[in-house]
């Protein structure tokens, strides 16, 4: 707890604040479409203020991210991309809850509830950090969305999604 609340001497926390302020400066320069997905680590160094730099600051575009799914999206994709990310989160949680309600068996309910709670947990944590640019968390997050989708399709009652739509449907 002491480390989490220390924003005056903890290098990790100070670097997070440095990354956030750099991301906001990037956003101010390109507010609508941002700098491009995944470009933060390559463009943020010149947007750091010297007074915000820490012992773990890098100036070489050799890694790092904005330490927030939402602030990172703002810098990388601007307002448009950020709204899409927020919409993805809202729709995912809504779809998870509706699929839970619609599921007809206990196993499906447990699985979709676990996947939905995982999505909620990840994107809540995403306020302070981001890992979707790494395979370690991207795979589980997108897998949870796939689980919700598969269970939703399974309980929808439609038997074949690949049949062409006929005129009387």
What annotation goes with each model-predicted range?
Residues 7-21, 33-77:
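Long extracytoplasmic/lumenal interhelical loops at the membrane interface
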Residues 27:
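Conserved short C-terminal alpha-helix that flanks the catalytic cleft of nucleotide-sugar-dependent
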Residues 46, 95-98, 126:
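Transmembrane helix-loop junction
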Residues 77-121:
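Hydrophobic transmembrane alpha-helices and their immediate junctions
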């Amino acid at each position: 707890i002491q480390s989490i609340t220390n924003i005056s001497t903890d290098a990790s926390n100070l670097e997070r604040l440095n990354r956030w302020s750099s991301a906001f400066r990037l956003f101010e320069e390109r507010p609508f479409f941002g700098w491009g997905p995944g470009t933060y680590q390559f463009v943020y160094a010149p947007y750091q203020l010297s007074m915000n730099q820490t012992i773990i600051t890098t100036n070489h575009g050799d890694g790092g991210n904005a330490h927030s799914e939402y602030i990172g999206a703002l810098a990388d994709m601007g307002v448009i991309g950020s709204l899409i990310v927020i919409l993805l989160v809202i729709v995912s949680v809504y779809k998870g809850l509706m699929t839970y309600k619609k599921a007809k068996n206990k196993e499906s309910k447990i699985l979709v509830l676990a996947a939905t709670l995982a999505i909620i947990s990840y994107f809540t944590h995403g306020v302070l950090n981001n890992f979707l640019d790494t395979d370690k968390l991207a795979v589980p997050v997108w897998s949870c969305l796939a689980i919700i989708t598969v269970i939703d399709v399974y309980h929808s009652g439609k038997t074949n999604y690949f049949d062409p739509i006929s005129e009387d449907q």
